[in-house]
Amino acid sequence: MESVIFSINGEIIQVNKEIITASPYNFFKRIQDHHLKDEAIILNGINYHAFESLLDYMRWKKINITINNVEMILVAAVIIDVPPVVDLCVKTMIHNINSTNCIRMFNFSKRYGIKKLYNASMSEIINNITAVTSDPEFGKLSKDELTTILSHEDVNVNHEDVTAMILLKWIHKNPNDVDIINILHPKFMTNTMRNAISLLGLTISKSTKPVTRNGIKHNIVVIKNSDYISTITHYSPRTEYWTIVGNTDRQFYNANVLHNCLYIIGGMINNRHVYSVSRVDLETKKWKTVTNMSSLKSEVSTCVNDGKLYVIGGLEFSISTGVAEYLKHGTSKWIRLPNLITPRYSGASVFVNDDIYVMGGVYTTYEKYVVLNDVECFTKNRWIKKSPMPRHHSIVYAVEYDGDIYVITGITHETRNYLYKYIVKEDKWIELYMYFNHVGKMFVCSCGDYILIIADAKYEYYPKSNTWNLFDMSTRNIEYYDMFTKDETPKCNVTHKSLPSFLSNCEKQFLQ
C-alpha cells in the first residue's frame, strides 16, 4: 500500500496515500500535486501527536480534544488548515477561558490570527482587568494593547484611581512608555492619587479626548421620599438604566455609600427612633441588617474614609448627642471615638486627609435650642476647636476639594443660602459667590474638577475659577442623592516618604 512519509521533529509517520487523496483540505491537495515519492515531507511547528489526531479526524471524523491538548491540536489545525478542527478547538478554549489564562490566550490568538479567540480573550481581560494585573504576562502587553483595553467602554474599573494603579503597575515593567499615563482623566481621580503620580515624576497632559470608560462615570443613587415608603433607585452609566434597588420605611435617617453598598443609618420608623443600620448591596440588591449603633438616634451626620463608615452626633429623642463612632465595612463592631465637644444634630462632617471636620447643626436640650456655627476637628485622637463659620447654620453640606472644605448651607431659619470656603492650613473662612437661593435640602458632592449640587436644579460649581453651570432637571420629591464608586482610595497626605506605603495599600485594595 503506497504511503506518504512525514517527518516531525525527527519522528517519521507514514500515511496511506488514499487518505491524502480523499482529503478536501488545501494542504493535502498541494501534497498530491507536488509530492516527491521517495522524500519525507518535513512539518515544522507541529506536534507529532497533534498531527496524528488530525489524521484520525480525517479518517473517522472524530477527534479527542481536551483542555490539555487543545492548544497543540489547534496549532496543527491552523498550519495544516483544517477549519472544522480549528472551530472545535476554539470553542473548547473559549469555554475554558478565565482570568488566570486570558492573557495567554490573547497572545496565542494574535500569534495565529484566530479572531474569535481574540475577541473572547479580550472580553475576559476587560471584565477582569484588576485580576489579570497579577498575571506575569500582564507586563508584556504592548502599550497599544493596554491602551485599547483601558479605553474600552466596558472595561471593569469603577474609579479612575484604579485605572491609575493598573497603569503604574504596567509602567513599572515598561519604563520607556510612561506617556501611556496620558490616557487618564485627572478630573475623575482623587487629589491623593494625583499627588502620588506627581511625586513619581509623571505628568498627565491635559486631554480633550472623550471619557470612554463608563465605569468611572459617576453612578447615582436616588432615594425618592414619600410619607411612608422611600424608593431607592440606582443609575449605572455602564448600562444606562435606572434599576430599583429596594425600599425603606424610615424617616429622618442619613445615608452613605461605602464599597458599593448603601448604608441607611438611624432615623425613625413609625415615629420611633431606631438603633439599626441597614445595608443594601447595589449590585446584588441584597439587604443586610448590620450591628446596631450605640444608641437610638436620628438626623446623624455621616462620612466615609479608608473603608469605614463614621456616624457623628444626632438627635436622641429631643436631645442632641455628641457620640461619634465608626464601623469598618464587612465587620460587626462599632468603635467609639471621644465625644464631640458640642453635641449636635443635622451638622456636616467631612474628611480632609485623615482628620474629621464637623460643623454647624443644632444643639438642643429640653430647655435649649441653639443653631451652631462652631467647627470641631478630630485629630490625634481628640476633638479640638477650629475657627467658627461666619454665620450660624442648622443645615450644612460640606465637601473636601483640593485639601480645603467647601460648605453650602440650606434654609430653615436663615433667609438665604451661603457658600463658604474653609482654608484648612490657615484655619480661615471666606465667603464666596452663591448662585442660587431659597433652597432647603440638597445634595452636594465633589466630582473631579467641580462640585455637584442637586437642589431645585442641577448645578456645577468650579472652585478654581469660582464659576457656576446650571442644568435644568426635575427634583420633585427627591430628597437624597448620592454619587458613589466601588472603591475608596486611602486618604492621606502623600509625601515622598509615605509614597511607597500608599501605593502598596492601593495595590492591595484595588488590584488583589
From Swiss-Prot:
Kelch repeats lie at residues 216-261, 262-307, 309-354, 356-403, 405-449, 452-498. It holds the Pfam family BTB. It comes from the Viruses. Transmembrane segments: none annotated. Keywords: Early protein, Kelch repeat, Repeat. InterPro entries: BACK, BTB/POZ_dom, Kelch-typ_b-propeller, Kelch_1, SKP1/BTB/POZ_sf. Residues 2-67 form the BTB domain. Belongs to the poxviruses Kelch family. This is Kelch repeat protein C2.
